[in-house]
């Protein structure tokens, strides 16, 4: 089992945690219906890039 020789510094801890933060979802407004949706996802009405897919 791997056991560390020295205690990791606060700097190393911070560097490891630098990618842990949460980001807000990137939202877009559909040009045709005016509905807000997550980018690269279909709208609630089933439209994607102005075409009905569902």
Swiss-Prot record:
The keyword Magnesium does not apply. Residues 7-16 have a biased composition (Basic residues). The keyword Ribosomal protein applies. Residues 1-26 are annotated as: Disordered. Transmembrane segments: none annotated. GO terms for biological process: translation. Keywords: Ribonucleoprotein, Ribosomal protein. GO terms for cellular component: large ribosomal subunit. GO terms for molecular function: structural constituent of ribosome. Belongs to the bacterial ribosomal protein bL32 family. HAMAP family: Ribosomal_bL32. This is Large ribosomal subunit protein bL32. The lineage of its organism: Bacteria, Pseudomonadati, Pseudomonadota, Gammaproteobacteria, Enterobacterales. The gene is rpmF.
